């Protein structure tokens, strides 16, 4: 089995509930989405990066893994594009190294997500709002439905799970409200089922105002009081 990787590096987690933790990032190449705020365009194509055998990639990860690393973060690109190779790689890490396995994904394919889930410790389930332009308007509901299924799968398998929504200048309050009701009312997700709910403001282009971020916060708070507005720390610090 071969896997295409854009980069492997150690830094601090710059997003989400584990912000500030020492992390080994494994960025897989290829992504089917085209979000306007994407900050890793060099990893969008399946021809980006370098191809490795799974065992070869594992050895590089092993040599790159520093002491006291909190987790190995599989990111992209979109890791689910290479789910078969990722499964083998994650299995080797679990058996031979033992750090927490974290998946950072758009959750565009719930079947691939479910395939990987037994090997995951931490799942970030990201919901793309329509203004992200991740997919065309006609297919956006499919993307959301898959992410909702992934959320349910992760919770049912008792994984550490949190939700992230990226907010831009054109993000819709009504759309977020519908999404929140689907999560907490229609799906009956309990607040204790998830580790956190992160609102992440877009950085660099189409940035939302503070007032907009607070309005989004207010939509979520009645359902989930531990909602947090957290920008990308690594962008603020100027690190990878």
Which sequence ranges carry the predicted segments?
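Structured loop/turn residues at beta-strand edges in well-structured enzyme cores
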Residues: 3, 33, 67, 118, ...
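Generic structural signal for well-ordered alpha-helical scaffold segments
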Residues: 13, 58-63, 152, 181-185
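Glycine/small-residue-rich loop that forms an oxyanion/phosphate-binding "nest" at active or ligand-binding sites
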Residues: 47-76, 80-84
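Short, conserved beta-strand segments within well-ordered enzyme catalytic domains
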Residues: 25-27, 71-73, 102
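Canonical Radical SAM [4Fe-4S] cluster-binding loop centered on the CxxxCxxC motif
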Residues: 3-56
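Short, basic/glycine-rich phosphate-binding loops at helix/coil junctions
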Residues: 36-41, 68-69, 128-131
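Conserved AdoMet/S-adenosylmethionine-binding subsite of the radical SAM
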Residues: 81-227, 232-240
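Ser/Thr-centric signal marking residues that sit
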Residues: 40, 75, 105
